[in-house]
Amino acid sequence: MKIVILGSGAVGGYYGARLARVGQQVTFVARGAHLAAIRERGLTIRSPLGDFVARAAAEERTDGIGPADVVIVAVKAYDNATALPMIAPLLGTSTTVLTLQNGVDSAVEVASIAGEQRTLGGTTYIATALESPGVIVQTGTHRRIVFGEVFGELPRLSDRVRQLQMVMQEADIQADAVQDGRVPIWEKFVFLAALAGFAGASRLPIGPLWADEVTRARFMDACREIEAVARAEGVPVAADVVDRIPAYVEGIPGSMRASLLIDLSQGKRIEVEALQGSVVRRGRRAGVPTPIMETLYAVLRPHAGGSGRAGAS
């Protein structure tokens, strides 16, 4: 299967490496020193599951790759304006495009280029970091992707979703195919958008946030705001989507920092528009109040473009 990884950083690079390792025809789309390292030495994965080096094609542009069977989109959401047009040269009559981006806006944005009929939506649970150009380090063993159809008649489990699930499982990826891809995306978003907002606003990892009873209560209220937006949009998230969050948090190391907080502390751009901003805009359209998320959005929005310097806060 010809698979193109659009965004070959910590997440996309990891999954692409696993697919390449079992013989899939993978092309990484990357830039700069990371691109050069992949071309020269391959992509190194360091993991508790075992270290390995994946060797595959790597390109900066997509116009010479040709039609792909599958395109996996894993760029940061703030890069969509420049990255998503790179999908167009990869499209053939049977191309499938799977987005694994954070947030709930991605599938529509991808479909504006690829078409709804080609677009799948999904989310991933994994802890990886780009340690240096060409080197990705995994913490823990989670490597789960949950995905499915997000357009057309739902729920349904299509043949292409089943086929892609099998390809991923053969690469030792924990792939779950679902009948409505919107559900896992929103269920993760309920927690992620709130966590990223509180972590970014407080500059704290999850442990101190959760330990403070006032902060914890407002955090849960923020999750309920996001859940209300999901239901207003007709997404059938689980009835206990918020109630099960405390048990989930108890299993997370207290030192865990949201990726938005990491980016913020390094002076990088942050995904505030795709996370907190999306909740606010969708809530307004649906007539759902989101006062906590609106406050977090207002606090973080000035940092959207980053400061360009490490240690910024």
Predicted regions and their residues:
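NAD(P)-dependent Rossmann-like dehydrogenase/reductase catalytic/cofactor-binding core
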Residues: M220-S313
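Short, well-ordered alpha-helices that flank and scaffold nucleotide-derived cofactor binding pockets
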Residues: A17, R21, P85-P89, S112, ...
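Rossmann-like NAD(P)(H) cofactor-binding subdomain of soluble oxidoreductases
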Residues: D51-I136
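Nucleotide donor/acceptor-binding cores
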Residues: M1, D69, R143
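Internal alpha-helical scaffold of NAD(P)-dependent oxidoreductase catalytic cores
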Residues: A37, P89-L90, I113-R118, E131-D240
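NAD(P)+-binding Rossmann beta1-loop-alpha1 motif at the extreme N-terminus of oxidoreductases
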Residues: M1-S47, D51
